[in-house]
Amino acid sequence: MARVKTGPMSRKRHKKILKLARGYRNAHSKLFRTAHQSVMKALSYAYAHRKKKKGDFRKIWITRINAAARMNGISYSVMMNGLKKAGVAVNRKMLADLAVNDLPAFAKLVDVAKAKGNA
C-alpha cells in the first residue's frame, strides 16, 4: 500500500479556516493558528447566542405586554393569570404584536383577563 501524504488536504483545511476568518483583524485573518482559534471561538459564540436569542425575544415581548397592560390598568402577571384562567390560548409573541399594532383588540383581552382575574 502506498504512503499517502497529507499536504494537499492540510492546505485545503487551512484555506477553509482562513476563508472563514476573512474580515478578522491582523494575524487573526492571516496566520492559521490564531485564525483557527478565532474561528472556533466565533462559532461557539454563534451557537450559544442563537440559543440566547430566544430568551432575548421573550424578554422584549414581556416588556411590551407589561407596558400595554399597565396602560390598561393591570399588571403583566395578573393579566397572564387571568388569560390562563379564561382559557385564552394566545402566546406572548402574539400578545406583544397586538400590544404594538392593535391596541383595541389588546384592550379586549385585558378586559377578559380582568373579569377572570377577579373571579
UniProtKB/Swiss-Prot annotation:
Sorted keywords for this record are: Ribonucleoprotein, Ribosomal protein, RNA-binding, rRNA-binding
Sorted alphabetically, which PROSITE patterns does this protein's record hold?
Answer: RIBOSOMAL_L20
Sum up the protein's function in the record's words: Binds directly to 23S ribosomal RNA and is necessary for the in vitro assembly process of the 50S ribosomal subunit. It is not involved in the protein synthesizing functions of that subunit.
Instruction: Fetch the PANTHER family from UniProt.
Output: 39S RIBOSOMAL PROTEIN L20
Q: Which InterPro entries match?
A: Ribosomal_bL20, RIBOSOMAL_L20_CS, Ribosomal_protein_bL20_C
Q: Which family does it belong to?
A: Belongs to the bacterial ribosomal protein bL20 family.
* Pfam families cross-referenced by the UniProt entry: Ribosomal_L20
Signal peptide position in this chain? none
What GO MF annotations does this protein's record show? rRNA binding; structural constituent of ribosome
Q: What is this protein called?
A: Large ribosomal subunit protein bL20
The Gene Ontology biological process annotation of the record reads: ribosomal large subunit assembly; translation
CC terms in the record's Gene Ontology section: ribonucleoprotein complex; ribosome
Where does this protein come from, organism-wise? Heliobacterium modesticaldum (strain ATCC 51547 / Ice1)
Q: What is the lineage of its organism?
A: Bacteria, Bacillati, Bacillota, Clostridia, Eubacteriales
